[in-house]
Amino acid sequence: MAPRVAPGGSQQFLGKQGLKAKNPVSTPNSHFRSASNPRKRREPPTIDTGYPDRSDTNSPTDHALHDENETNINVVVRVRGRTDQEVRDNSSLAVSTSGAMGAELAIQSDPSSMLVTKTYAFDKVFGPEADQLMLFENSVAPMLEQVLNGYNCTIFAYGQTGTGKTYTMSGDLSDSDGILSEGAGLIPRALYQLFSSLDNSNQEYAVKCSYYELYNEEIRDLLVSEELRKPARVFEDTSRRGNVVITGIEESYIKNAGDGLRLLREGSHRRQVAATKCNDLSSRSHSIFTITLHRKVSSGMTDETNSLTINNNSDDLLRASKLHMVDLAGSENIGRSGAENKRARETGMINQSLLTLGRVINALVEKAHHIPYRESKLTRLLQDSLGGKTKTSMIVTVSSTNTNLEETISTLEYAARAKSIRNKPQNNQLVFRKVLIKDLVLDIERLKNDLNATRKKNGVYLAESTYKELMDRVQNKDLLCQEQARKLEVLDLNVKSSREQLQYVSKSNQEHKKEVEALQLQLVNSSTELESVKSENEKLKNELVLEIEKRKKYETNEAKITTVATDLSQYYRESKEYIASLYEKLDRTERNNKENENNFWNLKFNLLTMLRSFHGSFTDETNGYFTLLNDFNASMEELLNTHSNQLLISMTKITEHFQSLDEALQSARSSCAVPNSSLDLIVSELKDSKNSLLDALEHSLQDISMSSQKLGNGISSELIELQKDMKESYRQLVQELRSLYNLQHTHEESQKELMYGVRNDIDALVKTCTTSLNDADIILSDYISDQKSKFESKQQDLIANIGKIVSNFLQEQNESLYTKADILHSHLNDTNSNIRKANEIMNNRSEEFLRNAASQAEIVGANKERIQKTVENGSQLLDSKSKAIHSNSRSMYDHCLALAESQKQGVNLEVQTLDRLLQKVKEHSEDNTKEKHQQLLDLLESLVGNNDNLIDSIKTPHTELQKITDHVLKGTTSLANHTNELLGLGDESLCNLETTIEDTSLVKLETTGDTPSKRELPATPSWTRDSSLIKETTNLNLDSDKKFVRETYTSSNQTNEPDVYDKPSNSSRTSLLRSSRSAYSKMKR
């Protein structure tokens, strides 16, 4: 903040120990003024105090590039302890600090709140334990050093109402013999520290103070009584943008800190305070206490602003600096503070100004283009302190209790944002002593006059209302004079601009006069030329009648030429359309060929994939078949071994029984006369032997039967399943090959039909184009030859009558006509040749494509037949072999069963015979012992013989089973060999087919470079019949003759040739005829 305050008038003198001041003498109840020198406030001389050159619309982005001299606002937080009322209410603490002085504070909400613990960091944080002295030494003392060095500094207190802002800034204002009390605030301590430093420096100085408040957006001086107070106004300093000047504020010089403390006490008593629910002594206004210091500069010092060194002859140089101590009114909630009526209005104005201050802080932090300084007088006064050239310190006071948590967080958030504001402090410029002395002398003289007039009572006494009215009139007249002066300046500028316009108009008039004289001379020359043109017109008038008759004939010829040219243009357009359709057909054919080629390669890839897949599946099936045969051979060998072992066991048991029988017979031979009991014993032993033999044979035959049945059933089911799988694989292969062949055949047929169609369309198109071009060429040649003779005969007459101008005109038209005819004929010839070339190339390509397609179809057909035969042969061979294996297995099984049954029956017969014999022996043993003994011996011999036969019969099935097994093994070996042959044939066929497919490819056309590329044909020449020079013979008058002569003269002087593709003139038609004639003669040759 940097307001320049106009002095209110006081006497000062400059001494060695400083500038001393006498208090002005004033009468509180009357206003006595000298008539010769009435007292009035005088604007001080402009003193450069280093305030920034800023406007309200300046953006902080001008300082985006941070200079090394830029500094952030110093933010200090002071936490107030709990009051007696809060202690009685048992309010909990929400703010915690790290001792008396730190750098952080934490916000801890109660458990019922949604807030969480949050930590804020600032330059310094003072807890409730910190006293006024600690706060002063760590926050204000460094700023005083900067003030002594020539910088402007601002310290302002910001916070909620009732948090101790006024106590921090002012505190206890009492003193005893120059000693401050313990509760003295920052302002009293700053005054004492300042004068202590000045007295110790032994330099001349002058200190003055001002104290005013901002109450309801109105500035009020606190150093004068309410009766003497005049309305203060804030103006922009025109000499320095960004500074403000406050008029109507009293500035008092002080010689020591006691004087300043006395002024502070008087102003504090006049300040607006009131009691609210939140604070018993709540400040209702913002107060600003300003200390202005003028200090003599010592020799040898360097002026940073003017970049010069102070020498010993610098007694007349002073440096000015200011310290602003701002006590802001606290923000408050109307509902909590209980403000009503007047207090509610005060609260609204306070909150509005603080809200504007917050918006200014946000705009500065966000580097906005517009800073709203003008929205409040508070922000206008603090303009230089926020983002300007002043060093600023912000003391934030907050409450530590949980009841004010919301306001505390809001205050800390604003303080945290304010830390980001950057100021660029600058040392104030030096001023000369005489500027300050002059101001002081005038004030002394004015005060002397006022004092003498008061003592002598030589003046005018006025009532207070009259005096105020008089002063208001004087001020209004001063303002009116200023306005009139501004209007005079504007009028002077208008007069100056009017003079300049008058000079410009006079110069323009002179130039216009010269132009008029030149035009008059040109008019005389034009009149002379007009007379000569009239005489020439009379000469041409007689020749015009003859020319019109000849032009009628020329018009007739032109109409015929136009008809022929129109026909040629129509033929040319049709040819272009035919050629465009031909190119389009070629493009479609090319696209179809590319698509067919892609289809062919896809078909080839799919066919190879399926063949390789079939080859893999066929190999897997064959390997499974071989595995099955090996398992079958192993099963047969195992069966043979099992049956052989069982027969050997049976033979061993039978041999053992018969050995026991032989032993019994031997015992029978030794004692023929055995008793019946012995015979019964023999009979019982024979029965036991018989029964055990029958049981062994029965178990053996059952095992053989069951094993043979299981083996036969397994082999049959596996063979049947293998046969089904092989048949299914062959069937799928045949279907896939047949579908691929059909797809290939369909593709080839469609390609043939497409190529035949393309060829037929191209032939028809070429024939049509050729016929049209030949007809057009014949018609054009006949017409050109016919018109040439007529045109040449008439040209001589026309040239003889109309002269050189008409001869040149006709010659240009003739050349243009022949030129266009040559161009048209060349286009027709090029088109015809391109059509022929394209037809030949397309015929060659289509024939070659058809040949390739036919050969490809033959190769695929042959491959199809060979593969089909191979597959059918393999399938038939597989069926036959499977049937043979099945029949052999079945016959072997049946033969095994038959042998087992026959053996069983033979044993049963032998056993039955033995039973009958034994029964007979038992019946007749008693009667015919001797006779039966011999018969018994015979029977035993026959039994031994039967035993041998039985052993032989048992050996015989074993031999037969061995033979059957050998036969089955031979059959399976033969089947494996045939299967290997079939696999070799299948592999060979599949490899041949795969090789054939891989070797088969599309034959691409060779590029010869003779095919004409597609190009854009020129646009069809168009023209209209030019009849501008053909005049009607009827209603002929002089005006039309003059117009015709002018047009003829203009057309004869034109040198620009017409564009070939623009609307042709008569000369273009002549050139077209010439070109057509030469083309026709070439065709005849």
UniProtKB/Swiss-Prot annotation:
Pfam families: Kinesin (PF00225). GO terms for cellular component: cytoplasm; kinetochore; meiotic spindle; meiotic spindle pole; microtubule associated complex; microtubule cytoskeleton; mitotic spindle; mitotic spindle midzone. SMART domains: KISc (SM00129). Residues 24-37 have a biased composition (Polar residues). GO terms for biological process: cell division; initial mitotic spindle pole body separation; meiotic spindle assembly; microtubule plus-end directed mitotic chromosome migration; mitotic spindle assembly; mitotic spindle elongation (spindle phase three); mitotic spindle formation (spindle phase one); mitotic spindle midzone assembly. It is found in: Cytoplasm, Cytoskeleton, Microtubule organizing center, Spindle pole body. Residues 1-70, 1049-1085 are annotated as: Disordered. ATP binds at G159, Q160, T161, G162, T163, G164, K165, T166. Residues 1065-1078 have a biased composition (Low complexity). Sequence repeats lie at residues 987-998, 999-1010. The modification Phosphothreonine is found at T1011. InterPro entries: KIF11-like, KIF11-like_kin_motor_dom, Kinesin_motor_CS, Kinesin_motor_dom, Kinesin_motor_dom_sf, P-loop_NTPase. GO terms for molecular function: ATP binding; ATP hydrolysis activity; microtubule binding; microtubule motor activity; minus-end-directed microtubule motor activity; plus-end-directed microtubule motor activity. CDD domains: KISc_BimC_Eg5. Keywords: ATP-binding, Cell cycle, Cell division, Coiled coil, Cytoplasm, Cytoskeleton, Microtubule, Mitosis, Motor protein, Nucleotide-binding, Phosphoprotein, Repeat. Residues 72-421 form the Kinesin motor domain. Residues 436-604, 715-740, 897-955 form a coiled coil. Its main location: cytoplasm. Belongs to the TRAFAC class myosin-kinesin ATPase superfamily. Kinesin family. BimC subfamily. PANTHER family: KINESIN FAMILY MEMBER 11, KINESIN-LIKE PROTEIN KIF11. Could be a spindle pole body motor. On transition from G2 to M phase of the cell cycle, the spindle pole body duplicates; the daughter pole bodies seed microtubules which interdigitate to form a short spindle that elongates to span the nucleus at metaphase. Mutations at cut7 block spindle formation. This is Kinesin-like protein cut7. The lineage of its organism: Eukaryota, Fungi, Dikarya, Ascomycota, Taphrinomycotina. The gene is cut7.
